[in-house]
Amino acid sequence: MVTKKARRDMDSTIPSSFHLAGCEWVVMMVPELPDMGLCNPSTYEIHIRDGMNEQATVATFFHELVHAVKFTMGETGHDEKEVEGFGNLLCQWYKTRQKL
């Protein structure tokens, strides 16, 4: 059985929840998740595989955040190359912003 837990103990980069267009999205760390991350627009949940290193976890969060934004905008067919590139740029921006 896969258990899910709300993200509480990871770096503050990753929120436990956030809002897009009036909907609350919940971020959960999921042990043994087959993929690194998953974005579910039906339940407004982002699942991230628990146990990855911080760099992989943060990059996965930003990748899944891009999916959440695209779903919120009504886009259902996501180009993974575009999502990965945009997610990596957001992650880089966030890390650079923290150092300023």
PLM segments and residue spans:
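Catalytic zinc-binding patch centered on the HExxH motif and its immediate surroundings
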Residues: 10-47
